[in-house]
Amino acid sequence: MSTVTTPSAPKVGFVSLGCPKALVDSERILTQLRMEGYEVVATYEDADVVVVNTCGFIDTAKAESLEVIGEAIKENGKVIVTGCMGVDANVIRDVHPSVLSVTGPQQYEQVVNAVHDVVPPRKDHNPLIDLVPPQGVKLTPRHYAYLKISEGCNHSCSFCIIPSMRGKLVSRPVGDVLDEAKRLVKSGVKELLVISQDTSAYGVDVKYRTGFWDGQPVKTRMTELCQALGSMGVWVRLHYVYPYPHVDELIPLMAAGKILPYLDIPFQHASPKILKLMKRPAFEDKTLARIKNWREQCPDLIIRSTFIVGFPGETEEDFQYLLDWLTEAQLDRVGCFQYSPVEGAPANLLDAAIVPDDVKQDRWDRFMAHQQAISAARLQMKIGKEIEVLIDEVDDRGAVGRCFFDAPEIDGNVFIGLEEGSTVQPGDKIMCRVTDADEYDLWAEML
């Protein structure tokens, strides 16, 4: 009697670097591979081939990408490279000539085909019986997911090379976005994080064309998209919002509890001179007035932003202007980066004085200390208040979660002590009272 052995599934290792947009690209590739019967493994040693999704936004990200590619080659030998750094394939091949394939961002089919070339899918695989969840493969915890609504960007910020890597704005059909959101919610997702290169430009490229979802007309526009997402009964958080005038239309939705009162707006600087050099909107006085107006309409509004210090041409006067602006703006969550030249960025050609590295570091230190004091004071005002917390982790010390003013990975946490025998699990939403705070985090007790 002969024994029939079933061939094992081909195995793929995957490393995803960079921003949430790249993470969504990775999820899409992995979903396709899983549908074709590939098994995703967690170690280089177990993989038949390794895919590295790179980041190429700044030099440190490129260095990390090259390092990870080298590590994958050393540990496995068969490496496929994709992502933003892939647009400059020669740089990758000069350092790592043995890579099997190099593709740029959003080239999903080429990546899958490259995997096929190295390790073909099983011929006997039946995709109709494969256990790929309806929402696809996700690299985030089950209770939150990134929802990418567009690709590319129409802006020409002088420090950025995103348009050259990801192209001009291409908005996803509104029906497709809402169908994906509905599948995610049905699968148990409690928080949708809306992302793109420029979320508030959604629909500009198609002139806000009217689409259809659930038999109803819906404009391909951020306001209408948020209205529809807000009807799904989950947290909806907006990231990468460019401060267009129509952002004002979102504040009533936040005040009414339809979407989270949270805006992630990368202002980048406040000095009119530096903003002009960056090719960013230079209406910092109007921005302060808008922030004041937003908070009058929605007192719970949380504003997150990112800034760059040490940009070419930045003087001490410009930097002090930025600190004074921060004092006026009273932003809740802030990140700061020291300017780093990016190959191919227009800023490299500016006729402006280069800021020395030691001055950049000094300004970064002062910026962070200044904003920490603002953040600490604003969080102190939360003590004694009742908040809803979405639980991310539970261990023997208690639970770690986030309330509406905390995005995962980039903002603070809420630490909660739990009684013995507690049934609280990741993904639960619980009501808590804030008992303490520091510069970034809150401590709370369960109600």
Curated annotation (Swiss-Prot):
InterPro entries: Elp3/MiaA/NifB-like_rSAM, Methylthiotransferase, Methylthiotransferase_CS, Methylthiotransferase_N, Methylthiotransferase_N_sf, NA-bd_OB-fold, Ribosomal_uS12_MeSTrfase_RimO, rSAM. It is found in: Cytoplasm. Residues 380-447 form the TRAM domain. It comes from the Bacteria. Pfam families: Radical_SAM, TRAM_2, UPF0004. One of its GO terms (cellular component) is cytosol. It catalyses: L-aspartate(89)-[ribosomal protein uS12]-hydrogen + (sulfur carrier)-SH + AH2 + 2 S-adenosyl-L-methionine = 3-methylsulfanyl-L-aspartate(89)-[ribosomal protein uS12]-hydrogen + (sulfur carrier)-H + 5'-deoxyadenosine + L-methionine + A + S-adenosyl-L-homocysteine + 2 H(+). Keywords: 4Fe-4S, Cytoplasm, Iron, Iron-sulfur, Metal-binding, S-adenosyl-L-methionine, Transferase. The keyword Transmembrane helix does not apply. Residues 10-120 form the MTTase N-terminal domain. [4Fe-4S] cluster 1 binds at C19, C55, C84. Its cofactor is [4Fe-4S] cluster. PROSITE patterns: MTTASE_N, MTTASE_RADICAL, RADICAL_SAM, TRAM. The keyword Cytoplasm applies. Binds 2 [4Fe-4S] clusters. One cluster is coordinated with 3 cysteines and an exchangeable S-adenosyl-L-methionine. Its EC number is 2.8.4.4. GO terms for molecular function: 4 iron, 4 sulfur cluster binding; aspartic acid methylthiotransferase activity; metal ion binding; protein methylthiotransferase activity. Residues 139-377 form the Radical SAM core domain. It is an enzyme of class 2 (transferase). [4Fe-4S] cluster 2 binds at C153, C157, C160. PANTHER family: RIBOSOMAL PROTEIN S12 METHYLTHIOTRANSFERASE RIMO (PTHR43837), RIBOSOMAL PROTEIN US12 METHYLTHIOTRANSFERASE RIMO (PTHR43837:SF1). Belongs to the methylthiotransferase family. RimO subfamily. This is Ribosomal protein uS12 methylthiotransferase RimO. It comes from Pseudomonas savastanoi pv. phaseolicola (strain 1448A / Race 6).
